[in-house]
């Protein structure tokens, strides 16, 4: 692992066009849920840099404002929070109208509760330049409208979404969002990475071990654990006699541990007495080399075996972690190729313009 002091010194020297270690992302998740007979829809907006939530807005709060969710954001001035609060409130009002509009598109009654979600963001490549952008809408937990990888056109999932697609095309919304994603979003992501570099650019290797859980006299479950790692991207695989064993592997989603790190496990059912034929392989950018684990009986500690896999080099590679958000709908995106960017005005909202009408 790269020495922490050296990493900080290198970070100080980084300019906007210089190389960051690995890729990084800035994403916003906005969710609105209608509440028939109970007033305005509930609206929540959260922002993430890589795997770290750094801002949040909730219109059910006693005093609804965009607030910091990461220590490195607490020193931002009132101008920033006023601007981001206005942007969130504007988006909440547009969502209120959009929920009513979509209910009409689908011929739904006013009695039911419905959910509208909007995710948008940008990603930097290892060279610190724009790599891809994404924007997606979902209605009642299902994809609705997606900005295509070229950031110039939309994909609608049904006839109702085609109405929104046509309205977006008429208003040149794709062009507006492309400008935000390629310019303003990138500039803010650089700023956040600089402000939170001690947290966002650090590597925390996983603590690994294997546990044994008898099922019957004939079978047992081997569970491979990875705990306390950052960033969230990690690979856990089981092998039998050196060959991949994925068909019967149970793999859980990477989960936040509550302390800024993540945890994950992968399990496989094996015949009793054949446990030593199975190995768990762990890959994470915080590890200098992949780790191979075998289960050891209780009388012996679990001993990690450093596995040197030919052609696999992890040193110096940092992969952007998966965004873990408390939202109903989430979809993985991939997009276009990188390019240069122009400097955006800091007066622009980090969230971009408010959501457009559907």
Curated annotation (Swiss-Prot):
Concerning what turns on (or off) its expression, the entry says: Pro-inflammatory cytokines including TNF, IL1B and IFNG up-regulate membrane bound HLA-E expression on endothelial and NK cells and induce the release of soluble HLA-E (sHLA-E) in the extracellular compartment.
Give a brief account of the tissues where this protein occurs.
Expressed in secretory endometrial cells during pregnancy (at protein level). The expression in nonlymphoid tissues is restricted to endothelial cells from all types of vessels, including arteries, veins, capillaries, and lymphatics (at protein level). In lymphoid organs, it is mainly expressed in endothelial venules, B and T cells, monocytes, macrophages, NK cells and megakaryocytes (at protein level).
Q: What are its GO biological-process terms?
A: adaptive immune response; antibacterial humoral response; antigen processing and presentation of endogenous peptide antigen via MHC class I via ER pathway, TAP-independent; antigen processing and presentation of endogenous peptide antigen via MHC class Ib; antigen processing and presentation of exogenous peptide antigen via MHC class Ib; CD8-positive, alpha-beta T cell activation; defense response to Gram-positive bacterium; immune response
Task: Kindly indicate where the leader peptide sits in this chain.
Answer: 1-21
| Coiled coil residues, start to end | none
Any single Gene Ontology cellular-component annotation? MHC class I protein complex
Q: Which CDD domains match?
A: IgC1_MHC_Ib_HLA-E
The UniProt annotation puts the region (Disordered) at: 333-358
Identify the residue ranges that face the Cytoplasmic compartment according to the record: 330-358
Swiss-Prot/TrEMBL keywords: Adaptive immunity, Cell membrane, Disulfide bond, Glycoprotein, Golgi apparatus, Host-virus interaction, Immunity, Innate immunity, Membrane, MHC I, Phosphoprotein, Secreted, Signal, Transmembrane, Transmembrane helix
Q: Where is this region: Alpha-3?
A: 204-295
Alpha-2: annotated span: 112-203
Ig-like C1-type domain: residues covered: 206-294
Effect recorded for residue 100 to A? Reduces the affinity for KLRD1-KLRC1
Indicate where the modification Phosphoserine is found in the sequence: 353
| Matches recorded under SMART domains | IGc1 (SM00407)
> Any transmembrane segments, and where?
306-329
PTM field = N-glycosylated.
Provide the primary localization. Answer: membrane
Amino acid composition bias (Polar residues), ranges on this chain: 348-358
Source superkingdom: Eukaryota
Mutagenesis or variant effect for residue 129 to A: Has no impact on the affinity for KLRD1-KLRC1
* Mutation effect (residue 178 to G): In allele E*01:04
How does the annotation summarize its subunit structure?
Forms a heterotrimer with B2M and a self- or a pathogen-derived peptide (peptide-bound HLA-E-B2M). Similarly to MHC class Ia assembly, HLA-E-B2M heterodimer interacts with components of the antigen processing machinery TAPBP and TAP1-TAP2 complex; this interaction is required for peptide loading and translocation to the cell surface. Interacts with CALCR; this interaction is required for appropriate folding. The optimum binding peptide is a nonamer (VL9) that is primarily derived from amino-acid residues 3-11 of the signal sequences of most HLA-A, -B, -C and -G molecules.
Family listed: Belongs to the MHC class I family.
Q: What is this protein called?
A: HLA class I histocompatibility antigen, alpha chain E
- Tell me which species this is from: Homo sapiens (Human)
């Amino acid at each position: 692992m790269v020495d922490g002091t050296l990493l900080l010194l290198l970070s100080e020297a980084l300019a906007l066009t210089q190389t960051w270690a690995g890729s990084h992302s800035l994403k916003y998740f906005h969710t609105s849920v209608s509440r028939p007979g109970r007033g305005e829809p509930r609206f929540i907006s959260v922002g993430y840099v890589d795997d770290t939530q750094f801002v949040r807005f909730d219109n059910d709060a006693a005093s609804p404002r965009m607030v910091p969710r990461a220590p490195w954001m607490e020193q931002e001035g009132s101008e920033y929070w006023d601007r981001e609060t206005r942007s969130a409130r504007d988006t909440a009002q547009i969502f209120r109208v959009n929920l009513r509009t979509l209910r009409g598109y689908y011929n739904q009654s006013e009695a039911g509760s419905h959910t509208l979600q909007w995710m948008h963001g940008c990603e930097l490549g290892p060279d610190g330049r724009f790599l891809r952008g994404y924007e997606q809408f979902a209605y009642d937990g299902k994809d609705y409208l997606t900005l295509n990888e070229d950031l110039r056109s939309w994909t609608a999932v049904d006839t109702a979404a085609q109405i929104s697609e046509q309205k977006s095309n008429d208003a040149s919304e794709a062009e507006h969002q492309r400008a935000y994603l390629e310019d303003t979003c990138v500039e803010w992501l650089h700023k956040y990475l600089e402000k939170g570099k001690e947290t966002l650019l650090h590597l925390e290797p996983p603590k690994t071990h294997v546990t044994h859980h008898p099922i019957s006299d004939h079978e047992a479950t081997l569970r491979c654990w990875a705990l306390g790692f950052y960033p969230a991207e990690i690979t856990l695989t089981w092998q039998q006699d050196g060959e991949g064993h994925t068909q019967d592997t149970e793999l859980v989603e990477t989960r936040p541990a509550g302390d800024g790190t993540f945890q994950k496990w992968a399990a496989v059912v094996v015949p009793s007495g054949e446990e030593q034929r199975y190995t768990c392989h762990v890959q994470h950018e915080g590890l200098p080399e992949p780790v191979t684990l075998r289960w050891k009986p209780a009388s012996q500690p679990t001993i990690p075996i450093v596995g040197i896999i030919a052609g696999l080099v992890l040193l110096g590679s940092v992969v952007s972690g998966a965004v873990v958000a408390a939202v109903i709908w989430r979809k993985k995106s991939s997009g276009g190729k990188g390019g240069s960017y122009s400097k955006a005005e800091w007066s622009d909202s980090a969230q971009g313009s408010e959501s457009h009408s559907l």
